[in-house]
Amino acid sequence: MSTGAPDSGHHERAVVTEERARAFLAAGELELLGRIPWASNATVLAKVTHEGLEGLAVYKPARGERPLWDFPSGTLYRREVAAYLVSERLGWRLVPPTLARDGPLGVGSVQLYVDADPEVTAFELLADEHPALARIAAFDVVTNNADRKAGHCLAGPDGRVWAIDHGLCFHVQAKLRTVLWDLAGTRLEAGVLADLESLAAEAAGGGPLAAALGELLDGDEVAALARRARALVRTGRLPAPRGDRAYPWPLV
């Protein structure tokens, strides 16, 4: 994952570690390049510069969130950050480095930009039976993702698959909407189940993860995360769709 191409001889292109990426996003200067037009909320492509490095990030300011009837106003950016923390705790590294910080349009989430192939979505990855999708589907179950569109699965230049756009996650009521229902019934690997069991214990146990999530979500949402993880461990399989609102719209 690259931080992006340079625009002068004074900047260098860098492949960054997770820790370095977070420091880069936290301390870097944000220059807004333009709004990403297909996003439903204000989503801005930004150039980040810090200590001779420059790269791209996706900035989602709280003030640009559209009001929703089922998610509290001004919380979507925090859900983006919470999804990253869950991904990291699981050890799956599905979500690009993401953090909350102040920016030119106020506080919001800042996520390292993934230079992905625009022709590859979850539909193409499903057709190729990419192994990362089962973990993404499990991740969506436990985070209760209400908006897993096909375009929210990105194929990076190294073949790695990333999951983005998690502002509509962590609701206490069942809201799972995804294009990954083709994987329903898939038995999850033992290692995946062990990761989920550990996540459930930590989310419910009042330790560092629970504390970090508690700064981003309310207590009921953190408790619901733990319950969903435990339930998925008990069944050991990805669930089937329920009801008539199982798919996001648009699909891509």
Task: Please provide the spans of the model-predicted regions.
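C-terminal catalytic region of ATP-dependent kinase domains
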Residues: G156-V252
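Juxta-kinase regulatory segment immediately upstream of eukaryotic protein kinase catalytic domains
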Residues: S2-A27
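Repeat-unit-sized solenoid/scaffold elements
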Residues: P6, H10, D115-A137, R230-V252
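Conserved ATP-binding subdomain of kinase catalytic cores across diverse folds
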Residues: A21-L125, E129-A146, A150-G151, P157-H166, ...
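Proline-rich intrinsically disordered, low-complexity coils
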Residues: P6, P67, P72, P96, ...
